[in-house]
């Protein structure tokens, strides 16, 4: 869930303090992700193609993961690297693409894959996020994921056109050397296709939650993007050393 072309005062622009707290400026190899290309030059057709490819990517991930989650993770890494490095709607600038060697992603660890129910804790709470492009973005809380030995994460629904389930998070690796992006990562963002499925139905339904597929918001790679980030209800005190790093 990323917005384009934020105004300078956008609360969630990379490098600024906002809802998620201070955002750390980190190096990503020799690539400078701070330089801004004009995102206004990205065509609507290219954006639509990026979205279609992302939905197809996660559909294939779910299919492969039903038999072999680690293989699905390898496929996910390969396809994301290809899209980031070559697609015209990639958040990487032209300069960053020229030296791009792949996203920094940890190897798969099955202990970070869960099948968990959505509890009612916190359900109905509203959260309004001021962005620089879409004005006030409204969320309503659907409930909570209780993650064994890790903590709790609020589960949000975009309360507007398109809907969608949204779960950002920030863990103890955020902003640390060799760790994750200082402002946090995304776990689920169904309006953009990032979803790993639900097993069962009704009260017995369980979400597939796999931190190995956690990924950085686009603003981690380009300051021209603004992104809703992890607030107090979406922070974990423990380290999550898997997924996309920074």
Enumerate the language-model features and the residues they cover.
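Short, positively charged and aromatic/hydrophobic N-terminal segments
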Residues: 9-11, 19
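Short conserved micro-motifs at the rims of enzyme active sites and ligand-binding pockets
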Residues: 178-179, 219-223
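A compositional/structural signature for long, glycine/proline-rich flexible linkers
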Residues: 21-162, 166-175, 186-191, 202, ...
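Acidic, glycine-rich flexible loop segments
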Residues: 177-213
């Amino acid at each position: 869930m990323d917005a384009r072309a934020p105004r300078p005062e956008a609360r969630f622009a990379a490098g600024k303090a906002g809802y998620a707290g201070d955002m750390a400026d980190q190096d990503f190899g020799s690539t400078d992700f701070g330089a801004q290309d004009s995102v206004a030059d990205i065509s609507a057709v290219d954006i639509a193609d990026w979205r279609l490819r992302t939905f197809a990517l996660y559909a294939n991930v779910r299919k492969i993961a039903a038999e072999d989650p680690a293989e699905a993770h390898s496929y996910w890494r390969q396809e994301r690297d290809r899209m980031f490095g070559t697609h015209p709607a990639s958040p990487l600038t032209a300069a960053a693409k020229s030296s791009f060697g792949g996203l920094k992603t940890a190897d798969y660890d099955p202990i970070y894959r869960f099948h968990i129910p959505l509890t009612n804790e916190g359900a109905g709470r509203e959260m309004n996020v001021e962005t620089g492009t879409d004005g006030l973005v409204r969320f309503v809380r659907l409930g909570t994921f209780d993650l064994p030995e890790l903590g709790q994460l609020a589960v949000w629904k975009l309360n507007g056109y398109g809907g969608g389930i949204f779960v950002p998070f920030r863990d103890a690796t955020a902003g640390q050397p060799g760790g994750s992006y200082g402002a946090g990562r995304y776990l689920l963002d169904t309006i953009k296709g990032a979803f790993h499925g639900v097993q069962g139905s009704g009260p017995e339904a369980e979400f597939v939650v796999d931190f190995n597929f956690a990924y950085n918001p686009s603003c981690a790679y380009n300051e021209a993007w603004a992104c809703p980030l992890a607030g107090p209800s979406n922070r974990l005190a423990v380290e999550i050393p898997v997924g996309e790093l920074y």
